């Protein structure tokens, strides 16, 4: 059927819903099969897809997989019932991360703290609480103000009692709070960002995402693993999310994770330079572990380059998850489990789902 202006939004809506229904399941026993994985997760609802990732040559499990539910409510029910134990092993379920997001700084880091940008002067703590408490139990809310003038800097933090609310919230790029557009991020301290950044230079291969030259690495315990980046690191060879123009875009002096770094060096989220967005203006700096630079540019409402096409959460059977070299199977390469030499270059495939 020929696509029309009416059918395209419907198809996009359907695809976006599917993206929110996918869970990544890490730490699987090598004995776990699709059947046992499906049998376990079907206690929370109907699965539309279930896969255990395997080496294309040996057919040995890589220790992780994906399940896709028929509704977002079923995903929420499954996550609310953690911990999960399959075949005698406690596994790690997480919301699947989009392909475009997977190479960005902190995309796979587990945190309970959420950064909220775009907070206006008329937005108070209770507005944030009313909006975000539907996602999970909130521990603390902070709206950052200027120490001298007392005026709001335009950003704040919401801390939950669990990481899953944060994972769920950041899947949705745009949020409207008190009538204003807001944007959310995982809030990583300077130490956490330095750990993420330093992992790029560690031994072993990369995460299996991003540049297909990575590969050769493991997602879990084993030689040269523990989220260590290879020659191209966690995303591309130019660092974490190079060219990611922060809040409002522009030339930047470090941007949101360009080559100067997302937490160290001159720029980035906790760096000592221009920082989160482009030069000048923005959300100010010098807050606790989060700032030595500015949190963004004065053109926050431009939303930088965030207006992207819908992303694919988790590998899709016809599109796959990342690089362009590994065409060895529908879900590509890379390793998750202990040991092993890793895949041959990320999640393979050029096409989209």
From Swiss-Prot:
PTM-bearing positions, type N-acetylmethionine: 1
Role, per record: Heterogeneous nuclear ribonucleoprotein (hnRNP) that associates with nascent pre-mRNAs, packaging them into hnRNP particles. The hnRNP particle arrangement on nascent hnRNA is non-random and sequence-dependent and serves to condense and stabilize the transcripts and minimize tangling and knotting. Packaging plays a role in various processes such as transcription, pre-mRNA processing, RNA nuclear export, subcellular location, mRNA translation and stability of mature mRNAs. Forms hnRNP particles with at least 20 other different hnRNP and heterogeneous nuclear RNA in the nucleus.
Subunit architecture: Homodimer; dimerization is required for nucleocytoplasmic translocation. Identified in the spliceosome C complex. Identified in a IGF2BP1-dependent mRNP granule complex containing untranslated mRNAs. Interacts with IGF2BP1. Interacts with C9orf72. Interacts with DGCR8. Interacts with TARDBP. Interacts with CKAP5. Interacts with TBK1. Interacts with STING1. Interacts with SRC. Interacts with PPIA/CYPA. Interacts (via C-terminus) with FAM76B; the interaction results in retention of HNRNPA2B1 in the nucleus and inhibition of the NF-kappa-B-mediated inflammatory pathway.
Example of a GO MF term: N6-methyladenosine-containing RNA reader activity
Keyword Phosphoprotein included in the entry's annotation: yes
Motif Nuclear localization signal location, chain numbering: 9-15
Positions carrying Dimethylated arginine: 203, 213
Any one of the GO BP annotations: negative regulation of transcription by RNA polymerase II
Cross-link (Glycyl lysine isopeptide (Lys-Gly) (interchain with G-Cter in SUMO2)): 22, 104, 112, 120, 137, 152, 168, 173, 186
Matching PROSITE patterns: RRM (PS50102)
Modified residues (Omega-N-methylarginine): 38, 203, 213, 228, 238, 266, 325, 350
Name of the protein: Heterogeneous nuclear ribonucleoproteins A2/B1
PANTHER family xref list: HETEROGENEOUS NUCLEAR RIBONUCLEOPROTEINS A2_B1, HOMOLOGOUS TO DROSOPHILA SQD (SQUID) PROTEIN
Biased composition (Gly residues): 202-223, 320-353
Entry's free-text remark on domains: The disordered region, when incubated at high concentration, is able to polymerize into labile, amyloid-like fibers and form cross-beta polymerization structures, probably driving the formation of hydrogels. In contrast to irreversible, pathogenic amyloids, the fibers polymerized from LC regions disassemble upon dilution. A number of evidence suggests that formation of cross-beta structures by LC regions mediate the formation of RNA granules, liquid-like droplets, and hydrogels.
Modified residues (Phosphotyrosine): 331, 347
Boundaries of every RRM domain copy: 21-104, 112-191
Disulfide bonds: none
Residues modified to N6,N6-dimethyllysine: 104
Main location: nucleus
Region (Disordered): 193-353
GO cellular component: cytoplasm; extracellular exosome; nucleoplasm; nucleus; ribonucleoprotein complex; spliceosomal complex
């Amino acid at each position: 059927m020929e696509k029309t202006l009416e059918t395209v939004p419907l198809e996009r809506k359907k695809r976006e819903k599917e993206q929110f229904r996918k869970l990544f399941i890490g730490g699987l026993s090598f004995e776990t099969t699709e059947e046992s994985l499906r049998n376990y997760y079907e206690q929370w609802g109907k699965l539309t897809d279930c896969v255990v990732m395997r080496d294309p040559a040996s057919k040995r499990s890589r220790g992780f997989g994906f399940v896709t539910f028929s509704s977002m409510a079923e995903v929420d029910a499954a996550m609310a019932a953690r911990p999960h134990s399959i075949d005698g092993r406690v596994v790690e379920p997480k919301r699947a991360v989009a392909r475009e997001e997977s190479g960005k700084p902190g995309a796979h880091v587990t945190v309970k703290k959420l950064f909220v940008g775009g907070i206006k002067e008329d937005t108070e703590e209770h507005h944030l609480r009313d909006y975000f408490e539907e996602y999970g139990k909130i521990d603390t809310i902070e709206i950052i103000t200027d120490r001298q003038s007392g005026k709001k800097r335009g950003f704040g933090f919401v801390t939950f009692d669990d990481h899953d609310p944060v994972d769920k919230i950041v899947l949705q790029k745009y949020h409207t709070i008190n009538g204003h557009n807001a944007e959310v991020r995982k809030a990583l301290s300077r130490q956490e960002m330095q750990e993420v950044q330093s992992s790029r230079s560690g031994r072993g291969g990369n995460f299996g995402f991003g540049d297909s030259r990575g590969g050769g690495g493991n997602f879990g315990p084993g030689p040269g693993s523990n989220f260590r980046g290879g020659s191209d690191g966690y995303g591309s060879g130019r660092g974490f999310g190079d060219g990611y123009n922060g809040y409002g875009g522009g030339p930047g002096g470090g941007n949101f994770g360009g080559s100067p770094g997302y937490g160290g060096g001159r720029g980035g989220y906790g760096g000592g330079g221009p920082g989160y967005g482009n030069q000048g203006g923005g959300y100010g700096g010098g807050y606790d572990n989060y700032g030595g630079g500015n949190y963004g540019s004065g053109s926050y409402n431009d939303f930088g380059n965030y207006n992207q096409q819908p992303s694919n959460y988790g590998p899709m059977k016809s599109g796959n998850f990342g690089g362009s070299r590994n065409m060895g199977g529908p879900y590509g390469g890379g390793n998750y489990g202990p040991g092993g030499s890793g895949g041959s270059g990320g999640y393979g495939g050029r096409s989209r789902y």
